[in-house]
Amino acid sequence: MAGKKFAAVAKKVDSAKKYTVEEAFKLVVETAPAKFDESIDVALRLGIDPKQSDQQVRGAIALPHGLGKEVKVVVFAKGPKEAEAKAAGADFVGADDLVAKIQGGWLDFDKCIATPDMMATVSKVAKILGPRGLMPNPKIGTVTMNVGEAVTAEKKGKLDFRVDKAGIVHAGIGKKSMGDAKLKDNFMTLLGAIVKAKPASSKGIYLRSIAVASTMGPGVKIEPNAAAAATGAN
């Protein structure tokens, strides 16, 4: 049955066509076939050499409409900073007790923040957090003394992005239930940040291709040049 549903909605998408951003997001919401609230994911292939240290593309942005889901936040902090994190709405705050829980297999959270003085403690679980993209990092604002602000930003739906070894940025930008207009706004915010993050040493075409898809739906290609121009970030 799932195969039949996919085949039925896939007919609505011309796999050879590159759509406008507006067309693409209307299509991706229309062609999300599952009964559950599917995630909407984008993949942007960049014309960079990810092996070069000066051609890394990464950053963090606040999406205008959040991610359409509850974000569970863990904070490694002590004393006044522990209280600050709790007041801001952190789901779990601690130190060695959190390390013990994580070492025991507990990973029921989406984001991890730490104060700088706690990084020696966090390093004990680096091999667990790192491969899952959960390791606190000062470059994306998750190693900070401003834990209250960081928790608030994560709860609102801050998106961390980075290029992978294949030169592609993969990102989830929301849920089907948010509707095409809000998803489009979130995408344009991400795209603008990626355009601004173009490495100075990158030569040739920067945005090579863009595709968007729901969890169970077909991929929809987006015309990259027009989309980038619409961000006003060139």
From Swiss-Prot:
This is Large ribosomal subunit protein uL1. Part of the 50S ribosomal subunit. Binds directly to 23S rRNA. The L1 stalk is quite mobile in the ribosome, and is involved in E site tRNA release. Gene3D superfamilies: 3.30.190.20, 3.40.50.790. The gene is rplA. It comes from Bdellovibrio bacteriovorus (strain ATCC 15356 / DSM 50701 / NCIMB 9529 / HD100). The keyword Endoplasmic reticulum does not apply. InterPro entries: Ribosom_uL1_bac-type, Ribosomal_uL1, Ribosomal_uL1-like, Ribosomal_uL1/biogenesis, Ribosomal_uL1_3-a/b-sand, Ribosomal_uL1_CS. Disulfide bonds: none annotated.
